[in-house]
Amino acid sequence: MATKKNQILVPDHIYVPKHEIISKTEAEEVLKKYNCKPTELPLIFVNDPAILGLGVKPGDMIKITRKSPTAGEGLYYRYVVEV
């Protein structure tokens, strides 16, 4: 079991893709581009270990940048919800 002294920070792990909060303007552009509502995006809980240090709140949108051997980089968007 991890103690506070040797606790693992999930966002710093090599297999966890980069997560970042996007601005309301950028979120609106994404929703317009994909012609969808925020609740139609994949959901992520506000207490998800990958986003704990970002200071997210329900209603925020997260951009996940994944590395891909074929595409190089892939973008993925998730909508933050309360548990």
Swiss-Prot record:
It catalyses: RNA(n) + a ribonucleoside 5'-triphosphate = RNA(n+1) + diphosphate. Pfam families: RNA_pol_Rpb5_C (PF01191). It is found in: Cytoplasm. InterPro entries: Arch_Rpo5/euc_Rpb5, RNA_pol_subH/Rpb5_C, RPB5-like_sf. It is an enzyme of class 2 (transferase). Disulfide bonds: none annotated. Its EC number is 2.7.7.6. One of its GO terms (molecular function) is DNA-directed RNA polymerase activity. GO terms for biological process: DNA-templated transcription. Keywords: Cytoplasm, DNA-directed RNA polymerase, Nucleotidyltransferase, Transcription, Transferase. Transmembrane segments: none annotated. GO terms for cellular component: cytoplasm; DNA-directed RNA polymerase complex. DNA-dependent RNA polymerase (RNAP) catalyzes the transcription of DNA into RNA using the four ribonucleoside triphosphates as substrates. PANTHER family: DNA-DIRECTED RNA POLYMERASES I, II, AND III SUBUNIT RPABC1. NCBIfam families: PRK09570.1. Belongs to the archaeal Rpo5/eukaryotic RPB5 RNA polymerase subunit family. Part of the RNA polymerase complex. This is DNA-directed RNA polymerase subunit Rpo5.
